[in-house]
């Protein structure tokens, strides 16, 4: 009986010790410090988003996305919530100056606005496991290429189908455009031939896996904003379009990876 009691106590201490270690290993998140950092970096305007509002966003929106990424195993390398949140622009949408260009060439259109090959799309209408927001690129005048999430691979949709898919009440889609349209078409062609069809046809023969890692210049696995970044980085040739950044590029941080000379303009918000 005494041996059984000793064994029971030993097991109890083992379990308690394990739980304490797990608790100790839990990440401590200083939301106030993160909020202050976001303000200092110019990412967040405290007059527009209060600390309490931002804290609520973390609890109800950002943390579930991060935990979903952990659950689905899309983070191929260790990534703390603090690091992840910073990479995702503290959950804040990118900013840009609206500058409309005159255009008389027939292209795909949506809501009375002309969309063109090479246009970049960023939206908060959806979030893949482990990523806040979503990014895509027009790989043709009437098609949009994207990585929608874990287990879905790379997909091409018609402009109308993609826009319908991500148009939602209270949500937005931002359209960014390169001023150099020759460059834009080069980038679109690269995206099409490298991330969908090597022949440029409507038949898909390039298959990519979804995964989030720090190997930004490796083609596979990939995720939504990495695919767009690579199309711009490699598709621009010798032109110094993108900064040689490293690590993870998220949808809300994508525009900041452009060099100042080639930073695209925000031409439409739906």
From Swiss-Prot:
Keyword entries, A-Z: Plasmid
InterPro entries, A to Z: Papain-like_cys_pep_sf
Role, per record: Possibly involved in pGI2 replication mechanism.
Protein name: Uncharacterized 30.3 kDa protein
